[in-house]
Amino acid sequence: MACPTRRGRQQPGFACEECRRRKARCDRVRPKCGFCTENELQCVFVDKRQQRGPIKGQITSMQSQLATLRWQLDRYLRHRPPPSITMAGELDEPPADIQTMLDDFDVQVAALKQDATATTTMSTSTALMPAPAISSKDAAPAGAGLSWPDPTWLDRQWQDVSSTSLVPPSDLTVSSATTLTDPLSFDLLNETPPPPSTTTTTSTTRRDSCTKVMLTDLIRAELDQLYFDRVHAFCPIIHRRRYFARVARDSHTPAQACLQFAMRTLAAAMSAHCHLSEHLYAETKALLETHSQTPATPRDKVPLEHIQAWLLLSHYELLRIGVHQAMLTAGRAFRLVQMARLSELDAGSDRQLSPPSSSPPSSLTLSPSGENAENFVDAEEGRRTFWLAYCFDRLLCLQNEWPLTLQEEMILTRLPSLEHNYQNNLPARTPFLTEAMAQTGQSTMSPFAECIIMATLHGRCMTHRRFYANSNSTASGSEFESGAATRDFCIRQNWLSNAVDRRVQMLQQVSSPAVDSDPMLLFTQTLGYRATMHLSDTVQQVSWRALASSPVDQQLLSPGATMSLSAAAYHQMASHAAGEIVRLAKAVPSLSPFKAHPFLPDTLACAATFLSTGSPDPTGGEGVQHLLRVLSELRDTHSLARDYLQGLSVQTQDEDHRQDTRWYCT
């Protein structure tokens, strides 16, 4: 016996609006249903319903596919012969069919977003915008409402585009050929692959152009070369062969893409392509911000390239923007350094393997055979990244006496090896910081390691000044002048002065041509002389200054010491140090402003300030004028030079007038 046909619970047709509002069962009788007739209500039927909004993930999927299509289009346009630098407004128009497809995508997604947030109130007189179509076979029926396109629609369009000379998405160089004003440009501006809806891909894309400028292969190659010719001298953290191997493979992780953008940004700032640096900076920062928003990773999984990119970006901001912005950006790099524990890279190594302090530095001593070349390069790159952050922390805080972030006492990472060893994969064991600072004799360490030691001494000088400049912070005035604080101050001051003088003498043994051609060595020597002036200023700031007549002074001097702890003696040493900075500054024009260390204007301005205010040397005015000329040559590439020139120009006007009057009288 056949089963009787079951009648559905829902009657055919649409319920009236009043029953829908009250969630009542409507009998769908026209022109007035039973419920409205019984309650004497106005019965309204709407035969044309608004389409439902997209389901979860459909908008994201369309955005992802559109971003991929834009990357394909840009790759297609970029392979055509462009001029050396092509602005976005000057690009040729894309093919008509591809541009129509992009416009159709924009309309579809914009309409879907509007439908998702629209109210449920519907009006029979509202006209719905029809979905534009690429061809007649894909066109929506006339008068039909806008809805999510057929899943096969994009596949058909993709096959049409893929039939051209475009390359697969996994081998793309991301760039924006058009001005993006829609919400879909978010992924492109952040330079990350579109987030997949259901699967995870390991392929990454990089972007070699920004929203307002496109870089040709020649420009990118030039920026890469400029980085190693000019920037690497004061930021020696990148392994040259590894980097160019990644460029040749054209495959990057997101962190490596961030690093590549940061390198080219800093290289553009130190070249005639400075007009490109602002656009590259904006793109680099957007890419780094996007990468920072990814889910947190374990501390040992922090990508080293991500830390390096933030460090290079902070150097760019110091060169082009200013100290305060550089400090904010560097703070993020310092925290990443701490999260990655780069200060403990050699915590498990045997400290007894390092040579004693009386022997020459061990930077040329080969490491055990168990450490191969690749492992050495990995460890050395981590060491150099940490020490670059360490130096940047101290040199940046020196500007305004800010507290240090990376503490010296917790460091268990060896000093960087020689550049020749690093670039040629020659393993070498270097000393720890405390061991290197105790060594005497001729230095055989790298210029980077010497800069680290001098920056460490400068950091100790800053701590020394902050601790004793205000006598009330440790003891009362009478207690400070006659108690243990006086003795402690003399011991620390004498130790720092001897340590700085010893390192300066070791650096003076380096040949003059090597110093003139090496921006790191030149800056390190000026930094040592600046530390001498810093110690002299510390003596001037304490509440007691007549230390030479104190009976405790001669007892505190070491047996081989030749300097006096009096303020006058320190002032004389500072005057000599300022004169040495003037002598070294004469090497800057031959060095080129494009290769000058970012913090070199600080040491030059410190010497100019000392010579213009408190130098007993009658030729100090000539030295000030020379330093001002050097700073004026650096102001186009170094923001510190511009800032110091504004203050020094006004400060030296009165001094020059008094100096001219004195010369006239004689």
UniProtKB/Swiss-Prot annotation:
Q: Name one GO molecular function term.
A: DNA-binding transcription factor activity, RNA polymerase II-specific
- Entry's Gene Ontology cellular component terms: nucleus
Gene3D superfamilies assigned:
Zn(2)-C6 fungal-type DNA-binding domain
User: Which BP terms from GO are recorded?
Assistant: DNA-templated transcription; positive regulation of transcription by RNA polymerase II
Practical use: Asperfuranone provides anti-proliferative activity in human non-small cell lung cancer cells.
The biased composition feature labelled Low complexity covers 353-369
Annotated region (Disordered), positions in chain: 184-206, 347-373
DNA bind region: 16-43
Question: What InterPro entries would the database entry show?
Answer: TF_fung (IPR050815), Transcription_factor_dom_fun (IPR007219), Zn2-C6_fun-type_DNA-bd_sf (IPR036864), Zn2Cys6_DnaBD (IPR001138)
Q: Does the UniProt entry include the keyword Transcription regulation?
A: yes
One matching Pfam family, short form? Zn_clus
Which protein are we looking at? Answer: Asperfuranone cluster transcription factor afoA
From what organism does this protein derive?
Emericella nidulans (strain FGSC A4 / ATCC 38163 / CBS 112.46 / NRRL 194 / M139) (Aspergillus nidulans)
Designated gene of the protein: afoA
